[in-house]
Amino acid sequence: MRCFKATIAYDGAYFLGYAKQPNKLGVQDKIESALNALGIKSVVVAAGRTDKGVHANNQTLSFHAPKHWNAAKLFYCLAPKLAPHIVLKKLEEKNFHARFDAQKRAYRYLLTKNLKTPFLAPYIACGDYGSLDALNTALKQFTGKHDFSLFKKEGGATTNPKRAIFNAFAYKTFIIGHECVVFKIIGDAFLRSSVRLIIQACVQYSLEKITLAEIEMQIHNLKATIRTPIMANGLYLHRVYY
């Protein structure tokens, strides 16, 4: 068997998340079904499992295929079976593990105050976010290594809730005629819905609905003020570092 590394992008609006689902509507379901149609039976491992509605620009996968498959032939056969909602960007033969070998993961979140067309609604979140300075002040609280037990969705079990965030900041830009705030958060790994809970906390602070002290208390597992993640549609798994 040969091990392959695949880089894909996908539209999270068409899936119930990355992980396999009982109704077969997960990204993993689609990829494994496409491989199975080619006679390849393999579990597909992802660098990170995104939630329902979350997109990916550069998700990384690892899987195995029989030796008669090479990267060029497999790319040619597999890419059309994934389209249009999953795009196979790159495929190479590489002996690695997509999840365990990943060193850092970068997420981006797009948020605008006024969405001018419904056609962008699945891809840019809409809502007030206060001031850019306040957002960056709040984001700074999350850098470093912390126990993120109170920044994960219920049911997101893990044996080790400690994660390191290397960089977290926000900036403004225009995307298809919309002024947006783009959040960028880079960490070694993230718990379930952790990125969206972090961004929600920062937005609520910027809107003066919570204080920095309340954010710090939640980071230190003293009290959970933010329990509901910000909407999923603005979030993108942007890059995985190896």
From Swiss-Prot:
Residue positions of the active site: 51
CDD domains, per the entry: PseudoU_synth_EcTruA
Residues that hold substrate according to the record: 107
Catalytic activity, reaction form: uridine(38/39/40) in tRNA = pseudouridine(38/39/40) in tRNA
Gene Ontology terms for molecular function: RNA binding; tRNA pseudouridine(38-40) synthase activity
Source species, domain of life: Bacteria
InterPro entries cross-referenced by the UniProt entry: PsdUridine_synth_cat_dom_sf (IPR020103), PsdUridine_synth_TruA (IPR001406), PsdUridine_synth_TruA_a/b_dom (IPR020097), PsdUridine_synth_TruA_C (IPR020095), TruA/RsuA/RluB/E/F_N (IPR020094)
Biological processes, Gene Ontology terms: tRNA pseudouridine synthesis
Assembly and interaction partners: Homodimer.
Known role: Formation of pseudouridine at positions 38, 39 and 40 in the anticodon stem and loop of transfer RNAs.
Cross-referenced NCBIfam families: hisT_truA (TIGR00071)
Family, as annotated: Belongs to the tRNA pseudouridine synthase TruA family.
Name under which the protein is recorded: tRNA pseudouridine synthase A
Organism of this sequence: Helicobacter pylori (strain G27)
Lineage: Bacteria, Pseudomonadati, Campylobacterota, Epsilonproteobacteria, Campylobacterales
